[in-house]
Design a protein with these regions (language model features):
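Phosphate-group recognition and catalysis centered on beta-loop-alpha active-site segments
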Residues: 1-213
Length: 213
């Protein structure tokens, strides 16, 4: 299974927007996207911790209510979507790998589980592994994955993969040919494939997270 990183992105569509997500679904692909929580506890699909890169405002998402973020983003015609809107668009038909970017409190994680409870295609992933372990403490059968960047030690990846409640691993493509990684009996997704040549080379035998193809 392959996932599109933050939705279809081209001259017409921008990353992490509902229009981009919808185009991905129309092509039959699931989504890998990032989420943050706003000051008023709304979950939004957005990559960065601040608005500086996208909206030229050096403001932290965690310190802003969603209404303020919506006001700023609307001026750029890039309305930041709520996670619940993405869930609705998916119609519970397409896989959604939801990457929790910051470390969430247990109360926020519980709220996240409640908001996504009817969407069985959702999988929670994070580089902040504390998020994943706390999700499992709240609900042990939650679909979750651990994310690893390069160069993480192979030994550490194997050790953490032994947890029976971890459903999958999200790995930098740096690890794609590693023999020890291949032996791990978990679903593995490799990120981020950015060209067609690479996609064609690895797509038949691996699960890929790709973009701009």
């Amino acid at each position: 299974m392959h996932l599109i990183h933050r939705g279809i992105v081209n001259k017409r569509y921008k990353e992490n927007l509902l229009e981009s997500f919808n185009q991905s679904f129309k092509k039959g692909y699931g989504i890998e996207t990032d989420i943050h929580a706003t000051k008023d506890g709304k979950f939004i699909c957005f990559h960065d911790f601040t608005l500086k890169k996208t909206f030229k405002k050096n403001l932290s998402i965690k310190n802003l209510n969603y209404s303020k973020i919506n006001e700023i983003s609307s001026k750029f015609n890039k309305t930041v979507p709520l996670l619940k809107d993405l869930l609705k668009c998916s119609k519970n038909r397409y896989p959604l790998f939801i990457e929790i970017k910051p470390t969430f409190s247990k109360s926020l994680l519980a709220k996240l589980l409640k908001e996504t409870s009817k969407f069985t295609k959702s999988v929670f992933i994070s580089f902040k592994h504390k998020n994943i372990y706390n999700l499992l403490k709240i609900k042990k059968n939650t679909k979750v994955g651990l994310s690893f960047s390069a160069p993480t030690s192979i030994k550490n990846i194997i050790k953490k993969s032994n947890c029976k409640n971890i459903n999958c691993l999200i790995l930098d493509k740096y690890f794609i040919n590693n023999k020890r990684i291949k032996k791990i009996k978990k679903n593995k997704y490799f990120y981020t494939v950015k060209n067609k040549k690479e996609f064609m080379k690895y797509s038949k035998k691996n699960n890929l997270i790709f973009e701009n193809l």
